[in-house]
From Swiss-Prot:
Gene Ontology terms: cellular component: apoplast
Name of the molecule in the record: Laccase-21
Cofactor note as given: Binds 4 Cu cations per monomer.
Pfam families from the UniProt entry: Cu-oxidase, Cu-oxidase_2, Cu-oxidase_3
Role of this protein: Lignin degradation and detoxification of lignin-derived products.
Length: 583
């Protein structure tokens, strides 16, 4: 019987069974195996008084949560019953020696075609905490996404008070239009993508949006209990501030790496990032006290010009068990920063520190082998830069240009076959060039104003090749009018420095934190500022690095690190699986 003939209710029930009845195999090579089946399908969802068909996994939006323990092997069978090509990325999972299952389209694999199947082997290593998975093709991750929760190994414990309950909180965005139609229009006319119609918390916009109040996500809490909020910013275009009215939040992890406990009124979380937050349900339940509190997510935006942006805030409701059916409206978090509060964002980011305990030590490299300064730029190219007959261009600067983006003056263009395939078989010629520059071309950049760099870019698939074990320091220098969440596949890195203005290589390294810097896989590079990261290139393979604002990735703010094999078998990339999708 074809899947299309199964009644919708039975289909969703079957998917739910497959999602939650996860097979756990005996340990293999010291790893416990966990098995999941993901079915990509078109599913109708109604939001903001409007129904549309979206791609989902197992009919769910957000998709199913993957549960694992540190060091497990998670095997995910992906069946593409949708109407377009797709890939899945396991965001923040290092995947030691296994780029074959990392997921970015045309970087480590060709996409899974409609009616096709691919089995991902997701190798957990040092991660503990919250990560996530998402589509890594076009704008599909708007709805094809879900949480990954990695618990400590059996016998180990959290390095903080054990929570009474864990609650995944996925922050996202919703468009009334088809997101991939918006993507195609953006590419066709060279303009920015239309802003989303709503922010969401676990797929719901909340009480402040039309036709949404009945479905607002609710969290039931009991006085005296502790809750672990596993917060993920899955948005395509927006940094977000997040807070819970009447409650402080204690940050205990970021990107599945533990932090020193940091108690705050709010957080700022960039797209791609995850944070583990402890919430103490400690509010008084007296006769005059409210028992309902808003959990709120508001966009943080640094763009200098007015845009048609709906800055209403997504909300969920934290409700105390009181037995009072007549509880009043929830309180709103007055501490939530305003839409453009750069100081609030920087104040939060500067406080993050790695835990640095005996069981979770810090190993910041003190000697650097390879220094890289990478300019992050938004560019404007002539409308006919890539097509001499371009007549549809309606981009900025009086409809004479189209948007582009670059790293060190190079706008990355994905090849027709994946980079990993070409590298593995020694056939990179004509697929990629291995001369990504360590420094930007000398161009004057005014960081005191709202800068852009018209025309200072070229298209290409340039990659950076690293010897195994090389210690790399990358300084990201923002030269544009907004911040950039930079994500590196295959590695976590230490964020050793963060600052405003132009990086000074004589002065700023003296300000680095080499004692307990946060250990992340996505860093928010401040507008007209810089961020310095360090990592050891000890994971052989092909690894994508890109801005996690998806429109910037489409415009070319990407590159690839190729890490060569080391000398021992355990320092060499795993063999190519036999079932890789074909281009």
């Amino acid at each position: 019987m074809g899947i299309a003939k199964i009644p919708a209710v039975l289909w969703l029930l079957a998917c739910a069974v497959l999602t939650f009845a996860v097979a756990i195999s005996p340990a293999h090579g010291g790893r416990t195996r966990r098995h999941y089946d993901f079915f990509i399908t078109e599913t109708n969802y109604r939001r903001l008084c409007h129904e549309k068909s979206v791609l989902t996994v197992n009919g769910q939006f957000p998709g199913p949560t993957i549960y694992a323990r540190k060091g497990d092997l998670v095997i995910v069978n992906v069946y593409n019953h949708g109407n377009k090509n797709i890939t899945i990325h396991w965001h923040g999972v290092d995947q030691p020696r296994n780029p074959w299952s990392d997921g970015p389209e045309f970087i480590t694999q060709c996409p899974i075609r409609p009616d096709g199947k691919f089995t991902y082997q997701v190798i957990m290593s040092e991660e503990e905490g919250t990560l996530w998975w998402h589509a890594h093709s076009d704008f599909d991750r708007a709805t094809v996404l879900g949480a990954i929760v990695v618990h400590p190994k059996h016998g180990d414990t959290f390095p903080f008070k054990r929570p009474d309950k864990e609650i995944p909180i996925i922050l996202g965005e919703w468009w009334k239009n088809d997101v991939n139609h918006l993507l195609e229009e953006m590419k066709r006319i060279g303009e920015d993508v239309k802003p989303s119609d709503a922010n969401t918390i676990n797929g719901q916009p909340g009480d402040m949006f039309p036709c949404s109040r009945d479905d607002t996500f609710k969290v039931a809490v009991e006085h005296g209990n502790t809750y672990l909020l596993q917060v993920i910013n899955a948005g395509l275009t927006n940094d977000m501030f997040f807070a819970v009215s009447g409650h402080r939040l204690t940050v205990v992890g970021i990107d599945a790496r533990y932090t020193k406990p940091l108690t705050v009124e709010y957080i700022m979380i960039a797209p791609g990032q995850t944070m583990d937050l402890l919430l103490e349900a400690n509010r008084s339940l007296g006769s005059k006290s409210n028992s309902r509190y808003y959990m709120a997510a508001r966009t943080f935006i640094t763009l200098p010009v007015p845009i048609p942006f709906n800055n209403s805030t997504a909300t969920a409701v934290v409700e105390y068990y009181t037995g009072d059916s007549g509880a009043g409206p929830p309180d709103f978090p007055a501490v939530l920063p305003s839409l453009d509060d750069v100081d609030a964002a920087m104040a939060f980011l500067r406080q993050l520190r790695s835990l640095g305990s005996k069981d979770h030590p810090v190993h910041v490299p003190t000697h650097v082998d390879e220094h890289m300064l990478i300019d992050l730029a938004i560019n404007f190219l002539p409308c006919n830069a890539t097509n001499a007959t371009d007549t549809a261009c309606k981009g900025p600067k009086g409809n004479t240009t189209r948007f582009a983006a670059s790293l060190n003056n190079v706008s990355f263009v994905s090849p027709a076959i994946d980079v990993l395939h070409a590298y593995y078989y020694g056939s990179g010629r004509g697929v990629y060039e291995d001369d990504f520059p360590n420094n930007p071309a000398p161009v004057f950049v005014n960081l005191t104003g709202d800068n852009d760099r018209p025309g200072v870019t070229k298209h290409g698939a340039k990659v950076k090749v690293l010897e195994y074990g090389t210690v790399v320091e990358v300084v990201f220098q923002d030269t544009s009018f907004e911040s950039h969440p930079m994500h590196l596949h295959g590695f976590a890195f230490y964020v050793v420095g963060l600052g405003s203005g132009k990086f000074d290589d004589r002065r700023d390294p003296a300000t680095y934190n080499l004692l307990d810097p946060p250990y992340q896989s996505t860093v928010s590079v401040p507008k007209a500022g810089w961020a310095a990261i360090r990592f050891r290139a000890d994971n052989p393979g092909v690894w994508f690095m890109h801005c996690h604002f998806d429109r910037h990735m489409v415009w070319g703010m990407n590159t690839v690190f190729i890490v060569k094999d080391g000398k021992t078998p355990q320092a060499q990339m795993l063999p190519r699986p036999p079932n890789m999708p074909k281009c």
